[in-house]
UniProtKB/Swiss-Prot annotation:
Pfam families: adh_short_C2. It catalyses: L-rhamnofuranose + NADP(+) = L-rhamnono-1,4-lactone + NADPH + H(+). It comes from the Archaea. Optimum temperature is 60 degrees Celsius. Belongs to the short-chain dehydrogenases/reductases (SDR) family. GO terms for biological process: fatty acid biosynthetic process; rhamnose catabolic process. SUPFAM superfamilies: NAD(P)-binding Rossmann-fold domains. Beta-L-rhamnose binds at S144, S146, Q154, Y157, T189, N195. This is L-rhamnose 1-dehydrogenase (NADP(+)). Involved in the non-phosphorylated metabolic pathway of L-rhamnose catabolism. Catalyzes the oxidation of L-rhamnose to yield L-rhamnono-1,4-lactone. It can also oxidize L-lyxose and L-mannose, and uses only NADP. Keywords: NADP, Oxidoreductase, Rhamnose metabolism.
Amino acid sequence: MLDFKGKNAVITGGSRGIGRAIALGLAKQGANILISYASHDSEADEVLETASKYGVKAHKVKVDQSDPYESIRFAEKAIETFGKVHILVDNAGICPFEDFFRISVDLFEKVWKVNVESHYFITQRIAKNMIENKINGRILLISSISAHVGGEFQTHYTTTKSALNGFMHSIAIVLGKYGILVNSLEPGTILTDINKEDLSNQEKRAYMERRTVVGRLGLPEDMVAPALFLLSDDNTYVTGTELLADGGMLINLQ
């Protein structure tokens, strides 16, 4: 069993979906957690309440990650709260489905700032804290299968997920000399709020289920085990890697 006792973990977008599942998975194994969230106070409170049952410290910070300066202040708040940060999960992301020809500059920039720019500067600040405290930290960026495949109504989103992987590759090189391992997790089609409306079309949902080789779409909880391994001290040599967790969707071309 992976042990995170005494570790301090920061998870962006930790009030719902994959971020929530990973945050609670870390708390269950002994990590103190601090989550960012955008709007849903009651959901963030529920995460903290559940985490506290595991005997760990749990904190929340409300953040607008479309504002890079607010994202930087969030990172500084996390450092102020914990002193030392051992784990960072860059999870927060948005995907407002839209036709390519209708995507405005404002919409593109908002998706870019939340999905890429905020994580760039949060990671920069947290990684510096790890180095200053001589922590062999772990950083995980939540990318997507969409970094490898196109989406008719996701041209802005797929762009950001490819960029996130490029960022991950580069900082894995930068931070390796300090004992900090950096990877990305690429979920397939997961049943979360981000695609709830899209998958309300039963025909579309059935098609997506058939595309997997396991015969079902993923749940946020399916992402916990691979994430926790990459974030654990048991991971001693995996860095700069994109781990695809998609139920076999990408390989299934039939």
